[in-house]
Amino acid sequence: MNTSPDYAQPGPNQFHHGAPSIYSSSSSNGVGGEVPITAQLLRGPPPPPPPPPTATATAATAAATTTTAAPSATGEPKQSGPTVPAACLACRSKHLKCDGGNPCARCQASESICQYVASRRGYKGPRRNGTQNPNKRHAAASDDGSPNSNGSNESCPMLLGAGVATPAAPSLSAFNPGLGIPETPMSTIGATPSYSGLQIYRQPYLDANGALVDINPRKAPQTIAERCIDSFYFHFFPGHPSVLPKDYLLRIAEQRNIEHLLAAMRWAGSLYFEVGPTRATFFEEAMRLMYAKDVPKDGFLVQAMLIVLVGLDGSCQQERARDILSDAERIAIEIGLFQRSFAAIHGQGIPVIEESWRRTWWDLFVVDGMVAGVHRQTNFLLFDIVADAGLPCEEHQYLAGTIPRPLYLDDFDNDIFSGEEYEFSSFAYRVASIRNLGRMMRLPESVFPGDNNVDRVENFLSNWRMHLPASKRDCLNKDMKLDEMMFQAWMINHACSIMLHQPLSQLDSSPARDVTSCAPYQMVRSGDTFNTHTRHIVTAAAEISKMVTYAVPITCHTHFFTCVLTLSSIVHLSKWALWFVQNDDDLRQQIRLNIGALNKLSTVWSAASRASGQVKGVAQEIFRSKKAAQQNNASFWVGFTQEEIISSMAADETIMSEINTMLEPVTTSG
């Protein structure tokens, strides 16, 4: 049998768009058989036996036969054969007589498909008054001899499928171009004026094998595991998009065992909604499968470890996350995931899989840099690996499976000088941003104002910002939706600017010394004036706070945004602790933005809950000390009227009340 698609005929799925098509085959296997249910309904009960023929009747019959055989010369209507209750669609479309057979003689001779549909002639619709008249006769007995007690219009023989067996399911063979049907989309056939009022099929109907099939089956409710996979793709995947898109991944899962990856995805997805003790079960299963003796060391294992370590890091299990990160790095280097040839060798000739391997390496690269940068406990091991894996493409291309030819780091670094006009993806700019963080982490520990090494790294940061194309200068894509890869790229750039310049700034960090949820406290001595390094960190901290204002669910960002917000808050708090601060209200609003974002993130990540508590506590302490100093200093109130003093104190009380409200415990989902 030729299995290639015939684009001249509609596919089987088209017959199930909306109401099923009225054009169904008289027999699902193409051979004449059981009378269609439409013909059964239209024929009704068998007629009574005719009376014995008389001479008059015999003569009339002979005359009718003669009249039928010879054309009428007067143009009067010709006498036809016995009246039949319906004509098939083929005869109707050609305006020919039909003998009502199944199949009828014409269709049998032309080898056409003989189909019937109920006529609405004589049908006056349902009664307006639902009360039955007891003096009227009820419906005739059903075919099996039992009376029909259903008085509703569902029992009306004008509606197909009422109280009788239903026809076979529509199939591709049921479509007959010879029926003269206009070339309209199949989805509109059921809505044509001639048949729009008919109940064509009742559910369930019979399939080709005679089995009952529900044409509108109710979708079974999702299991917790399935909901967790969907949650993973909605919340976690946009921030770390290395695994295959869902449809591709499920196909791979049918071909080989990737249960360890699915287990890791289920656990990560369970972090975003309440699943009870199932979450711990998912985690134990993921750990057991990842470290099973027979698990293959391949890219799928690296992906599973990457997901788990990110989840653990956001759940305040940083040491355990670092252990898994070390294992993932070792396996990635052993299998050559960083090499250009890896994607081609292990991609099975499928561009989406090849792209997934490239993304796996670079996402591991970014995560390694973020862990090293925000926690300052590791040294960004993968930064020293000479990698030539292709750079990832845009997110919409990856999800659609339209993978372009990959570009490489050499193309990115030499873009301006080569004369080539390349368009790099947001993921590529994210990689470039984390490389600048790696350069900063390779600086000597002791730096001093005017150090050329600091200036060199700042040149990288500034060049990254200045040479962004117009479409990448904010975190929105061309559809005005959040571009999470550019969001992270900007986030890393601002965080790197703070980490680079804070040791040389003149902003005393001691007021925020208790904010240690992400990294240990680093003392910065204050100075008499704000130097250029202080300006860098104040600007970067304000830009990070501005990133909170994007109208997207903040829990869809990577959890590393928690530590970047904390870094920004330390700068804000250090500046707010000064005696006189310009734009004091703007600064307080930025602190409130950061605390609000940390509160939202804490519903998923316990690390955010810890950071939020520390930032709130420091903000409360600074506010109290500033308030006490102001009230105890009599000269402070010189020039204020009594009304202004009372108004100022009332405003302070309002701020204090807001901070206390923020200090209320946040219930986390884990």
Curated annotation (Swiss-Prot):
Q: Where is the composition biased (Pro residues)?
A: 44-54
Q: Where in the cell is it found?
A: Nucleus
Molecular function terms from GO:
DNA binding; DNA-binding transcription factor activity, RNA polymerase II-specific; zinc ion binding
Which ranges of the sequence are annotated as binding DNA? 88-114
Q: Name one GO cellular component term.
A: nucleus
User: What CDD domains would the database entry show?
Assistant: fungal_TF_MHR (cd12148), GAL4 (cd00067)
InterPro entries the record matches: Transcription_factor_dom_fun (IPR007219), Zn2-C6_fun-type_DNA-bd_sf (IPR036864), Zn2Cys6_DnaBD (IPR001138)
Q: Which domain of life is it from?
A: Eukaryota
Which residue ranges are recorded for the region named Disordered? 1-84, 122-157
Q: Name one GO biological process term.
A: DNA-templated transcription
The protein's UniProt keywords, in alphabetical order, are: DNA-binding, Metal-binding, Nucleus, Transcription, Transcription regulation, Zinc
Q: How is it used?
A: Iso-A82775C is a precursor for the biosynthesis of the anticancer natural products chloropestolides A to E via a Diesls-Alder reaction with maldoxin. In the absence of the prenyltransferase iacE, siccayne accumulates instead of iso-A82775C and can also be condensed with maldoxin to produce chloropestolides H to K, which show also antibacterial and anticancer properties.
List all Low complexity biased stretches.
55-74, 142-155
Pfam families the UniProt entry points to: Fungal_trans, Zn_clus
Write down the PROSITE patterns for this protein, in alphabetical order.
ZN2_CY6_FUNGAL_1, ZN2_CY6_FUNGAL_2
Give the protein's function.
Transcription factor; part of the gene cluster that mediates the biosynthesis of iso-A82775C, a enylepoxycyclohexane and biosynthetic precursor of the chloropestolide anticancer natural products.
Protein name as it appears in the record: C6 finger domain transcription factor iacK
Its organism's taxonomic lineage begins at: Eukaryota, Fungi, Dikarya, Ascomycota, Pezizomycotina
